[in-house]
Amino acid sequence: MIPYFYFNGEKSAKIRHDYWRTVSERFKEAYSVQIGDWCRENNLLFTGHFLQEDKMGLSCRVNGSVMPHYAAEDIQAIDMLTERTEEYITVKQCSSVSNQLGRGAVLSEMYGCTGWDFSFEGQKWVGDWQYALGVNQRCQHLALYSLRGCRKRDYPPSINCNTSWWKEYKTVEDYFARLSYMLRCGEPIRTVLVVHPMTTVWSRLGCSPYGNPKRNQERDIPKLNELGDTFNSLVKNLCKKHYDCDLGDEVIISEYGSCSDDKFVIGKCEYNTVIMPFCENLLSETYTKVME
């Protein structure tokens, strides 16, 4: 069966699907769940972001499926580099899990790689966009103690006293402090669920037996990243039409999903509309719950 993981054939989809599901479940249990359990036993909160959250093919390769890892955290968190306002999936994956499990806080590491000339206007613009998608707490990147040597060019800016605008930064902080407080006093209500197509990515992601010519450009990765871009466009267009939505990961659905009074339920959230895009296959648990 192993050759089917590398070569395309009639059994390739199942072999790859089962492989990546196993990787995802074992990584979660051996890493995220253990860290989360240890933190709670020692009166700590577990948070942090995972790698390549924004690229569907790469995310599968390094995480299996990233959303189940968020379920192990006390504070779900992401990292959004540069002045990005076109990529919705990273925020939505994280905020959806927080919403479904009733965790409350959604933390975002912001402003990395924006440069020394990044303005207050830019910080508000990027922050407002992420807050509209579900973030409610910022973690600014970064606060350097010193600018000596290579530090000056290490993913600026530095949100600290070594910037010219530090004494005026209260203006930005007060704004986001009030916005964070207001949003965390309430609960988001989203009635539309979009099923995440990661299990389809599992069935497509193989590996070339002849090696990889370029890092992050392995044989199947680019096309799966394109699938992620198309999925992102769907979520973006829903939001632009004012249909705010949560994403539904099938592993989380299998654990927390149910049906009640014509509603599709995941944890603490109820949905009256379920969209299933780009799904070439479903976990049996998802299929059963949807058909109910």
PLM region descriptions:
Residues 1-292:
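Carbohydrate-binding surfaces of carbohydrate-active enzymes
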